[in-house]
């Protein structure tokens, strides 16, 4: 069996389609377990630490669709992690302080690929 190497420019194609974000948000809102009306009427204020990754795109967009006031912390998706990106207690000092300072209802911290999260309660812990 021969191994064929390809130059990086010959590895395939990709496409940009901004509609997928909205499609994904709509799928989440359509889930029976999401109490959309209750959330929209609750006047929540939430701090989001997107660790400068994809979570900084999706989580604020989802919360805004739910009429949640979203305070963004590290939500520029540039890949420059402002702290260790593992959503563990010892990495939550920035968001903990901001949740308290902003009198937020809670905070959401995600890891870079948004498959794990940590929640910070209104007291910052």
Predicted features, each with a name:
Residues 1-102:
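Gly/Ser/Thr-enriched, mixed-charge loops and adjacent short helices
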């Amino acid at each position: 069996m021969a191994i064929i190497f390809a130059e990086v420019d010959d590895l395939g194609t990709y496409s940009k389609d901004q509609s997928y974000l909205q499609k994904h948000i709509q799928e989440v809102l359509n889930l029976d377990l999401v109490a959309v009306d209750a959330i929209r009427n609750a006047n929540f204020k939430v701090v989001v630490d997107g660790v400068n990754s994809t979570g900084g795109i999706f989580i604020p967009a989802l919360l805004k669709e739910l009429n949640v006031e979203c305070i963004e912390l590290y939500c520029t998706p540039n890949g420059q992690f402002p702290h260790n990106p593992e959503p563990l207690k010892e990495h939550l000092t920035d968001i903990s302080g901001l949740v308290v300072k902003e009198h937020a209802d809670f905070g959401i911290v995600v890891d870079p690929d948004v498959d794990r999260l940590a929640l910070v309660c209104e007291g910052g812990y």
